[in-house]
Amino acid sequence: MAALIGWLARPLSQRPDQLRSSLADLLDHDSTVGSSVVPKVPPGADHVPLEIRVGLVSQSPITAFRPGPNVLCRYQHGDVIPAQELMKRIASSPQDEIHCSGGPVQINQKHYQGDVSLLKGQGDWLPVVSLDLETYVASVVGAEMPSSCHGEALKAQAVAARSYAMAHLARPATTAYHLGDTTRWQVFAGEQSTTPASRSATRETRGIILSYSGGIVESLYASNAQVIAEAHGHLGHSMSQSGAQQLAHQGLPFNAILGRYYAGASLARLTWHDQ
């Protein structure tokens, strides 16, 4: 089994009393594609509602903030901020926190679902959006790969994006958010990059992650093999998005595509564990 440098073996749960992943060895050793073992797709399970916090690094500084009609924004101490006063308060407040909930918001030119916190430190305000993991994955899939790509390639991307996100749930980038929204992590563009195709790929792989030796795979990926060699070569195995598209057109399902790029990994599905 390949030595996978840069892959994590971290606890899956923010709530270890409830959340477990079915991390048994799910490799199908009788099914191979070339020299690659095809990971077996785990059985279906109910949706596991996990929240992820994304730092909207690309949207700082905030030049426009428009809450939806049902959104309520408050300072950390509880005082409500009228919608028409928000940008004035953002421009004038020295250091504070603003929390908005109750519906979608527009930040600069992009729309986001979920609760939004505006954090002010020594520099510009940083928006942090808190949303369901699966909603997040659907946006990442649409931002990282064109929706015109083959459905199986998009499913492989969904699993890779979910696994990467889970690794950062276990090991957050900062105390304020789990990961950012740029290529430094994986691209997240809110509603702008969420499409019917990205939703379908996310739904059809709901809760599936890559696992290795009982831990989460920090599933690195890049647009093509050259970028992988230049950027990820020292970190272990990575998925080529253009290569995944080619393999999908050759007839490989998403799990076989993942088996090609993450040798030795198995697929597991997030489930609740009742005590």
Label each PLM-derived region with a short phrase.
Residues 1-275:
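Conserved, single-site charged/polar hotspot
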